[in-house]
Swiss-Prot record:
Name of the protein in its database record: Serine--tRNA ligase
Annotated positions binding ATP: 262-264, 349-352
NCBIfam families documented for this protein: serS
The keyword Nucleotide-binding appears for this protein: yes
Residues annotated for L-serine binding in this entry: 231-233, 285, 383
Gene from which this protein is expressed: serS
BP term (GO), one: selenocysteine biosynthetic process
Location of the protein in the cell: Cytoplasm
Molecular function terms, GO-annotated: ATP binding; serine-tRNA ligase activity
Enzyme class: ligase
Family named by the database record: Belongs to the class-II aminoacyl-tRNA synthetase family. Type-1 seryl-tRNA synthetase subfamily.
Functional pathway: Aminoacyl-tRNA biosynthesis; selenocysteinyl-tRNA(Sec) biosynthesis; L-seryl-tRNA(Sec) from L-serine and tRNA(Sec): step 1/1
Primary role: Catalyzes the attachment of serine to tRNA(Ser). Is also able to aminoacylate tRNA(Sec) with serine, to form the misacylated tRNA L-seryl-tRNA(Sec), which will be further converted into selenocysteinyl-tRNA(Sec).
Length: 415
């Protein structure tokens, strides 16, 4: 969440940030500011009543010791206690209103993030590796997968519904090999390998920003306070939920391979064929918790770590700076890595590395202690990489004229 103090002290800054996202919430912000102002007034009243209660209680004790009549003081204490209880309840209700309203306001846009409306305004930073020139028309991955018997889309629909797949045979071996390669590269770059639950409670999804605003995008277990994770960002980040970390232990660098589950609400008609957009997919995630001064450097490190894997797999890719209108809810700054897909003749996102600054840390109460003072940490997350999309890129970039797939040398030892 954004800092409630900032909203009171610099309302225009928050409003401008939302406009940069093309998400003007002026009315909601104004109502929130009114609630916070009212809350502060009531809090001052409450503190005054508490001070008065303490003062009268001391007088009551002194008079009791002196065996002086205390009936008037006793009545005053009782009346004041009723007012205190009523005011405490009012303050508590206002706090809940504030937290609920703050929880649906997205992160402030970083100064480095360029202005823009949508993905058309994103800026290419650099390209890595030159796309191969084919002597034949390259096929799309779903054609190659079916030809080689690696992916069974029909069985995925039979077992579940559309946007599910079954990977089998040598395709399954490649899929497993990619996961092992990704984890090995991430570990080499200093990220601790962690396996986490694929189910989390509501508090964890609130901590990383999926709830309450994006409830329709996650799968909930019926009659349980449990949800299937949309990304290991949720579990890795929330390992430190409500935790104070010693500054000497920063940065904390983690990686995890997990299945991910997304309802893909609002994606009807997009990427209906193949493995680009699935309800269930595997991803190897990077998460870092850092000192605020180090988060920009960490973002670069995470990008290079993901890029290193793509270079090893001989997959052309590029870095793209997301504009303000294309940022995710929790992100302050995001750089995507897009991989070249010759079958589609375009670049597609395969990793998204985001710096959330202290936005998630404030929601999840992730702090560090420095010089005897507790401060909010910065959190970052990014794919390294989306396994299915990496397999898609592998098939399309390394296809041969007969439909067979060349295996890059870096992957051979894992097969």
């Amino acid at each position: 969440m954004i800092d409630r103090k900032l909203l009171l002290q610099d309302f225009d800054k928050v409003a401008l940030s939302l406009k940069k996202r093309n998400n003007a919430m002026d009315d909601e912000l104004e109502r929130l500011r009114e609630v916070i102002t009212h809350y502060k007034k009531r809090l001052i009243e409450l503190e005054g009543l508490q001070a008065f209660q303490n003062k009268v209680s001391k007088e009551f004790g002194i008079k009791m010791a002196q065996k002086v009549d205390t009936s008037d003081l006793k009545k005053e204490l009782e009346n004041n206690k009723i007012k205190l209880n009523e005011l405490s309840k009012s303050v508590g209700e206002l706090e809940q209103q504030i937290d609920l309203k703050l929880s649906i306001i997205p992160n402030l846009v970083d100064e480095k993030t360029p202005l823009g409306t949508n993905e058309e305004d994103n800026i290419e930073i650099k390209k890595i590796l030159t796309p191969r020139v084919f002597t034949f028309k390259p096929k799309e991955h779903f054609e190659l997968a079916q030809q080689n018997g690696w992916i069974d889309f029909e069985s995925g629909v039979k077992l579940a519904k559309s946007r599910f797949s079954v990977i089998r045979g040598f395709g399954a071996k490649i899929y497993r090999a990619l996961i092992h390669l990704m984890l090995d590269f991430n570990e080499k770059n200093g990220f601790e390998i962690i396996y986490t639950p694929a189910l989390v409670n509501e508090k964890m999804l609130f901590g990383t920003g999926q709830l309450p605003k994006f409830k329709e995008d996650v799968f909930k277990i019926e009659n349980e306070n449990l949800y299937l994770i949309p990304t290991a960002e949720v579990t890795l980040t929330n390992l430190y939920n409500d935790t104070i970390i010693s500054v000497e232990n920063l940065p904390i660098k983690m990686t995890a391979h997990t299945p991910c589950f997304r309802s893909e609400a609002g994606s009807a008609g997009k990427d209906t064929r193949g493995m680009i957009r699935q309800h269930q997919f595997d991803k190897v995630e990077l998460v870092a918790i850092t000192h605020p001064k180090e988060s920009d450097v960490m973002q670069e490190h995470m990008l290079e770590s993901a890029s290193e894997i793509l270079k090893a797999l001989e997959l052309p890719h590029r870095f793209v700076q997301l504009c303000s209108g294309d940022l995710g809810f929790s992100a302050s700054n995001t750089i995507d890595i897009e991989v070249w897909l010759p079958g589609q003749n375009c670049y597609r996102e395969i990793s998204s590395v985001s710096n959330t600054r202290d936005f998630q840390a404030r929601r999840a109460k992730i702090r560090f202690k420095e010089n005897q003072k507790n401060q909010l940490a910065h959190t970052l997350n990014g794919s390294s990489l989306a396994v299915g999309r990496t397999m898609v890129a592998l098939m399309e970039n390394h296809q041969q004229a007969d439909g067979s797939i060349h295996i890059p040398k870096a992957l051979e030892k894992y097969l």
